[in-house]
C-alpha cells in the first residue's frame, strides 16, 4: 500500500493478529485476507483451488453418509472406485446391503466391505425370490459398527452369529423376518463366543422370537445390558423370552408397551424395574 493511503486501508488487526474461524483452514483465511489487502478484483487460481478443495470432504460426508447396495449399484461403485485410496467408503456411516430378492448384491461385495472403516450402522435386508447368497463366515466387518439390523428371510441363525462375532462394539440389535432352518447341532452353545456391549436397544420381531434366537443372546458371556427392549410376536410367550427380558432387568429403562403374544399384552410389558 502507498504511504498516502488512509489508516482504514491498513487495518492493524490484519497485519498483527492471526484471524481464525472454526472449520475453515487457516490457509484459506490467509488467502482471503491477502486478497482483501491487495484490493484486487481478480480472484487468484490458488484461492479457487483452496476453497474448492476445502469442500470436498464435507460434501463426501453428506453424499455418502448412507449407502444402499443392490445388484446394479455394486458394479457401478466398484467401477467408479476400484482403489481404496479413491473410495469414499470411509465417509459412509450407514451401510445397507440387499442380500435377498432379485436385486440382491453379488458376492464380490464382501471383498470391499473392509474399506468402510467408519461405518456405524449395518443393515442386511431382503426377502424370498432368489437363491441364498453365500455369505462368508468372516468378511472383515469394520469394528466401528455399533448397530446391526437384520430384516430378511434368507439367512440362518449361524450366519447371524458369525456376523455378530465380528462386532465387538455392537450396542443396538434389531432382528426381524424369518430364519432359514439349520442343523440343531450347530446351535449348541451358539452364543458363547459373542462379545459386544449390548447396552442400547434390542428389537425382536416375527420369526426371531424363538427359543434358539433368544438362547443365543442369553449365552453371551458379557451379559445383556440393553436399556430398551421391543418384542413383537403373535405366538405363545416362550420361557426364554421372559428370561431375556429379565436378564436386562438391572439396566432396563424402557420396555416396549407393544409386546404382545396371541393378541394379549404379556404381564412383563408393564416393567417391574425403574
Model-predicted segments: where are they?
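PEST-like, low-complexity acidic/proline-rich intrinsically disordered segments
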Residues: 1-21, 31, 216
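Secreted/extracellular small peptides and ectodomain modules produced from precursors
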Residues: 2-3, 46, 57, 263
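Secreted/luminal cysteine- and crosslink-motif detector
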Residues: 4-6, 64, 266
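Conserved functional hotspot residues or short segments at active or partner-binding sites
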Residues: 254
